[in-house]
UniProtKB/Swiss-Prot annotation:
Glycosylation sites: S92, N254
PTM (free text): Gamma-carboxyglutamate residues are formed by vitamin K dependent carboxylation. These residues are essential for the binding of calcium.
Ranges for domain Peptidase S1: 210-454
Propeptide, residue positions: 21-40, 182-209
Cellular localization per UniProt: Secreted
Name by which UniProt lists this protein: Venom prothrombin activator oscutarin-C catalytic subunit
Length: 467
């Protein structure tokens, strides 16, 4: 019985062997999912073959040095290695506004185009008023995380939300008769057209006027106003702000008993009573101190009388605008300080005196003068430069235009619109090297000017007021 049982067990074992084989051994296709054979590197002829990135790093794992041997270039190796180690971080195009992505190990770097910043170039810089004025043509105001553009009076905001479109033929600050190429050729010489502080010249010469200035052609300085006395002699300048308001210097007000205004003229040699505009009311800044009695305009200087040196004339009848008579635009304080006064140049114009105590120039002159750094301005002056003043001009020329157009305009152009930035006020000496023209800083008085211009007073007898 026992031999029969043993035989049965042996037969059963032999019968089960094929089944066991099918359970232990997998088909090659299935087995390759789990087991992969790597081709052996550095075979007998490996070192004699040129580098191949597929053989070195794709078919087998390679080191950075091995990759370097293939590329033979550090930059190409670095680019490959950053992707090889952990994939391409730039594949999702993380850099906005056409920024350029550079992959790194576990990171990436965006190189932004001009005007954009942030890790992903996601911040548009011109949405800050501090950068290119927010791309606004006139005024820029920050609003939460954005900016808001607006325009000077008489202009409409363009559909793009940045540009300003003139709403009429005689909108402020428009130089209708453009200077074309003459603008670029305006002389870069300082002629501080003021000479309130004067020393007598040893050799007065008829050539000393707005030195190297150019004639301002008809319509090129349309905001220029001239203050004349009862004899129609010009004694100060002014700037047209609106049909009934003209800006000037406060120290001009006490120079004559009667003030009339002339506009639209480039030659004042001919008397013409019909062109005179009567002044209805005069507003002098409340902090301006008039010169003392017995004050001689050319020989004495009282600094107190030149701080807050600003006044506004109100006309009895409106000024008629034309292509030769246009007001200058009034800026906001921020726009003037942060944009206009950071330009290279301003433009001054006037009928400057020919020489010290000499007659006025009969033709209107214009020139551009650079803004002067405040610290340099203060160091150059023996008299204090107050916060209501700024300097413009050069320090190297030995001549300037003594006793010119006090009260006249200092204009700064921005995107083809001309804004009032200063009033010709005073200067130390005449033709002195290292000295600059000093101007009333209009940005300090924007609210004061607007408060006066909002008034609509009935016509009254000519009078002088203080506000």
């Amino acid at each position: 019985m026992a031999p029969q049982l043993l035989l049965c067990l042996i037969l059963t074992f032999l019968w089960s062997l094929p089944e066991a084989e099918s359970n232990v051994f997998l088909k090659s296709k299935v087995a390759n999912r789990f087991l992969q054979r790597t081709k052996r590197a550095n075979s007998l002829y490996e070192e004699f073959r040129s580098g191949n990135i597929e053989r070195e790093c794709i078919e087998e794992r390679c080191s950075k040095e091995e990759a370097r041997e293939v590329f033979e270039d550090d930059e190409k190796t670095e680019t490959f290695w950053n992707v090889y180690v952990d994939g391409d971080q730039c594949s999702s195009n993380p850099c906005h506004y056409r920024g350029t992505c550079k992959d790194g190990i576990g990171s990436y770097t965006c190189t932004c185009l001009s005007g954009y910043e942030g890790k992903n170039c996601e911040r548009v810089l011109y949405k800050s008023c501090r950068v290119d004025n927010g791309n606004c043509w006139h005024f820029c105001k920050p609003v939460q995380n954005d900016i808001q553009c607006s325009c000077a009076e008489g202009y409409l905001l363009g559909e793009d939300g940045h540009s300003c479109v003139a709403g009429g033929n005689f909108s402020c600050g428009r130089n209708i008769k453009t200077r074309n190429k003459r603008e670029a050729s305006l002389p870069d010489f300082v002629q501080s057209q003021n000479a309130i502080l004067l020393k007598k010249s040893d050799n007065p010469s008829p050539d000393i006027r707005i030195v190297n200035g150019m004639d301002c052609k008809l319509g090129e300085c349309p905001w220029q106003a001239v203050l004349v006395d009862e004899k129609e002699d010009a004694f100060c300048g002014g700037t047209i702000l609106s049909p009934i308001y003209v800006l000037t210097a406060a120290h001009c007000i006490n120079q004559t008993k009667m003030i009339s205004v002339v506009v639209g003229e480039i030659n004042i040699s001919r008397k013409n009573p019909g062109r005179l505009l009567s002044v209805d009311k005069i507003y002098v800044h409340q902090k301006f101190v008039p010169p003392k009695k017995g004050y001689e305009f050319y020989e004495k200087f009282d600094l107190v009388s030149y701080d807050y040196d600003i006044a506004i004339l109100q006309m009895k009848t409106p000024i008629q605008f034309s292509e030769n008579v246009v007001p200058a635009c009034l800026p906001t304080a921020d726009f003037a300080n942060q944009v206009l006064m950071k330009q290279d140049f301003g433009i001054v114009s006037g009928f400057g005196r020919i020489f010290e105590k000499g007659p006025q120039s009969k033709t209107l002159k214009v020139l551009k003068v650079p803004y002067v750094d405040r610290h340099t301005c203060m160091l150059s002056s023996e008299s204090p430069i107050t916060p209501t003043m700024f300097c413009a001009g050069y320090d190297t020329l030995p001549r300037d235009a003594c006793q010119g157009d006090s009260g006249g305009p200092h204009i700064t152009a921005y995107r083809d619109t001309h804004f009032i930035t200063g009033i010709v006020s005073w200067g130390e000496g005449c033709a002195q090297t290292g000295k600059y023209g000093v101007y009333t800083k209009v940005s300090k008085f924007i609210l004061w000017i607007k408060r006066i211009m909002r008034q609509k007073l009935p016509s009254t007898e000519s009078s002088t007021g203080r506000l």
